[in-house]
Amino acid sequence: MIAPDLTMDIPTELGRVHFVGIGGSGMSGIARLFLAAGHRVTGSDSRDSDAVQALRELGAEIHVGHDAAHVGDADALVVTGALWQDNPEYVLAKERGLPILHRSQALAWLISGQRLVAVAGAHGKTTSTGMIVTALLEAGRDPSFVNGGVIGGIGVSSAPGSEELFVVEADESDGSFLLYDTAVALITNVDADHLDHYGSHEAFDDAFVRFASAASELVVISSDDPGARRVTARIEGRVVTFGEDPAADIRITDIVTDGPVAFTLTHDGVSRRAALRVPGRHNAINAAGAYAVLVGLGVDPDDAIAGLAGFSGTSRRFELHAEVRGVSVYDDYAHHPTEVRAALEAARTVVGEGRIIAVHQPHLYSRTQMMAGDFARVYEELADHTIVLDVFGAREDPIPGVTGALVSERFADASHVDYLPDWQQAADRAAEIARDGDFIVTLSCGDVYRIIPQVIGALERPAGSAQPAASSRPRE
């Protein structure tokens, strides 16, 4: 994988900007903002998608497949850390000496000078960002924003606004969240992840200390998460804490998780009851952090509570895709044991008497090797049956001996898990197990959502009918 130079000087003028992997959730949102700012945007992606089509309709010229010819007369290349070094567009840009910008560099360049709210943390970033944006709009504000997923009720992951206020989901995975000139920082948690980049828990903490210390106006940070508490102890300036901790500045109590979550927020001695349209205890926590940011931006506390009630979720966060013969099929972005726990606990609050059938696609060889036992314990505790696919390697080369079997082999009761690297077999198995009232939930930040049409097809086939020939994951 490539490692963009995050310290490079960027030209003051950029005309045509070429995005490699433009269809990704983060990249497509940034490309949309470049188009809105009047730049000529071109790009390439390995496959067509709704995101690609939407950008074309806005004026972007996008190719399916990668070829050096696509670079053309571009003034700069925008990439992610998941790009392979032999990508022909990257190779040509490097030969020409073109600026090659990480997506966060490109965004930081574009929004320079605006009042920036940056949301970071190992879990909950996309949801928290979506909550802040939704509530600001509900309160009559008009920020620009870019999020890691499409925000329900808004229908896009990014949009320009009329205010000099920008809300961004900041990516800590490769340290690029340190590029932003942040005014208000929200840290949802500091649960160690991405150690393939940072190398140690200490280095991971250090990055968040730098991120928080750079915020010029306000730091909002969890008081429940041990990692966040370590960071809080090392920073100065205006800090507002949130959580169930009795010492939190904004305290959460009386959480009710039977269906959409409801809870009480106590701030400056005043308690307010809040209710969301999304399930899960973790979303009460996310909402408390978002509330703190909103009040810090001058939103009336009652308006903040009302605005949060309008949030209906984001794409790939416990997102319902279909209901077939009484079986609900959901997808979730969870790819860390903590996130899987939150997603499955949320599912448990709404499934009623039904069962949860989890389809887990391990993400990254290094994470699978390090956390296989943690994943197995969470799935065995909270899912009624788990189907494990093979590893989605993303930016990593394979590690010998590391497959999805590492997770399935850690189950104490092997009857509760299947390791099925063949996607059609996995879809058929999920449909075979499922009955009226059950949930099938796919979980990963890889491409596991692409198995959903196969799951739906398997559910729609009459019992005992012939099944299609088994196949691996859908081809690009």
UniProtKB/Swiss-Prot annotation:
Q: Which UniProt keywords apply?
A: ATP-binding, Cell cycle, Cell division, Cell shape, Cell wall biogenesis/degradation, Cytoplasm, Ligase, Nucleotide-binding, Peptidoglycan synthesis
Answer yes or no on keyword Nucleotide-binding: yes
* Gene Ontology cellular component annotations, sorted alphabetically: cytoplasm
Enzyme's top EC category: ligase
Which EC numbers does the record give?
Answer: 6.3.2.8
Pfam families in alphabetical order? Mur_ligase (PF01225), Mur_ligase_C (PF02875), Mur_ligase_M (PF08245)
Residues given in the record as ATP binding sites: 121-127
Task: Give an example GO biological process.
Answer: regulation of cell shape
Q: Where in the cell is it found?
A: Cytoplasm
Q: What is its main location?
A: cytoplasm
Q: Which reaction is catalysed here?
A: UDP-N-acetyl-alpha-D-muramate + L-alanine + ATP = UDP-N-acetyl-alpha-D-muramoyl-L-alanine + ADP + phosphate + H(+)
Q: Which molecular function GO terms apply here?
A: ATP binding; UDP-N-acetylmuramate-L-alanine ligase activity
Task: Please verify whether the record's keywords include Transcription.
Answer: no
* Gene3D superfamilies in the cross-refs: Mur ligase, C-terminal domain, Mur-like, catalytic domain, NAD(P)-binding Rossmann-like Domain
Output the superkingdom of the source species.
Bacteria
Pathway given for this chain reads: Cell wall biogenesis; peptidoglycan biosynthesis
Instruction: Return the PANTHER family for the record.
Output: UDP-N-ACETYLMURAMATE--L-ALANINE LIGASE, UDP-N-ACETYLMURAMATE--L-ALANINE LIGASE-RELATED
Say what the protein does: Cell wall formation.
The UniProt family comment states: Belongs to the MurCDEF family.
Q: What is the name of the protein in this document?
A: UDP-N-acetylmuramate--L-alanine ligase
Gene source species: Clavibacter sepedonicus
Gene name as annotated? murC
